[in-house]
């Protein structure tokens, strides 16, 4: 039997997070040495799901203020960032959640190797999802930030959301994440990522 092909997603240029590209909304990026500006890609899509022990709420985020309010009101907040080539959105996430420049660069680097790293008050987990595309095995980057009462996922734009099953479980109350906290949500997202390997093995 012929072996299946394996390939990764296409390589992107790393998003420039320098302050020269600061948006009109006033989100200042972290300082860099002599960064060269690159054109931004399509705007990233930010989906927020917040929950407690009894209910949950979902929305598409348009402003930083929405993230700040959600963090104050809900015990567990998950922000899924779909799109790695939108430096304005990346800077906004860094400002709201106090994510450093090096960690942000890791989050939006498509070829980042899987790893776990602690950045002060946050844990960064770089991983890869696996799927079939025809006869080829395709791996897509996903980066998770675990912080105090929140999880952030950065991932490529994909036709199929690898975490939709997690959303459904939270919507229908089939998890105890609202009681158990953001670390339980992070563990569930990693479980789903790893489970995706079994059909390929």
Name what the model sees in each region.
Residues 1-201:
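Peripheral, non-transmembrane regulatory/ligand-interaction domains of membrane transport proteins
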